[in-house]
């Protein structure tokens, strides 16, 4: 089922995450592995970015597709991900473009840990 359309229904957009969060809480589910742009990520329902990916299969999809398209059309040696957070962009680009060297920077320790867990 394509869950992306659920983001556009106001009532569902608010209710759906609440119900899923409660289910995760009841069953004591912390992180769950989920494939996004053909890369596996460990996602936490309590993190807004990760919740959007998990529930709606969506997070900055237009920006990611724009980046992928432009990287396909040009010849780049490096990709710099400043403020990499959990590594979303770095891992997607690294998965699609093995010849590009990825340099990721993230100053926040908890985000660095998440990034390392996603490697």
Language-model segments: residues:
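S-adenosyl-L-methionine
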Residues: 1-118
């Amino acid at each position: 089922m394509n869950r992306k359309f659920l983001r556009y229904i106001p009532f569902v957009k608010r209710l759906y995450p609440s119900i899923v969060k409660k289910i995760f809480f009841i069953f004591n589910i912390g992180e769950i592995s989920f494939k996004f742009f053909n890369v596996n990520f460990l996602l936490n329902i309590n993190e807004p970015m990760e919740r959007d990916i998990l529930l709606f299969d969506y997070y900055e999809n237009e920006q990611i597709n724009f980046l992928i398209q432009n990287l396909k059309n040009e010849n780049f040696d490096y990709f710099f991900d400043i403020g990499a957070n959990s590594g979303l962009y770095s891992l997607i680009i690294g998965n699609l473009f093995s010849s590009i060297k990825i340099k990721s920077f993230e100053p926040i320790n908890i985000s660095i840990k998440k990034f390392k867990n996603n490697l």
